[in-house]
Amino acid sequence: RLTEKSVILAGGTDLMPKIRSGKKEPDLYLSLCRMEELKAIDRQGEWLKIGAMAAHTQASEDPFIRKYFTALAMACSQVGSQQIRNKGTLGGSLANASPAGDIIPCIFLYGGKIEILGENGIRSVDAESFLLENGCTLLGRNELITSILLPLEEERKSCFVKLGSRREV
């Protein structure tokens, strides 16, 4: 059972700097790194299911995402530095709920849903209700994001433009 100080470790790109600086002092790490099913990107009926552990690079290079969810592919290709894109996960970006999160507007744009696993099973929430405010989400204690669901529609046009002076962090 997770405690108040326990942390779920996915890519660790946001969490590890907080631990190193002393802002977080976990008593337990729950690593998701070996959960291959959480890295999958699959079509499931009328939805594209993106595992929460899918890395930004993986999503930016996925042919299905590039074709049907172009803005998301473009946003994923511009997150942080190459190292961050290789390790950082889409689920981690959502859980972090940063207002600077590049993928968050894209998930909203496409009417995405977030699947959350907790003690009572899996629940699905609209992406727009998942994020409450800067750094706050609907995630309860002992819950984790398992996937992002995007509705499949006919091919649509979209793009992502990052506003800012830096090319990489």
Locate the predicted segments by residue.
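C-terminal structural segment of proteins
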Residues: R1-V169
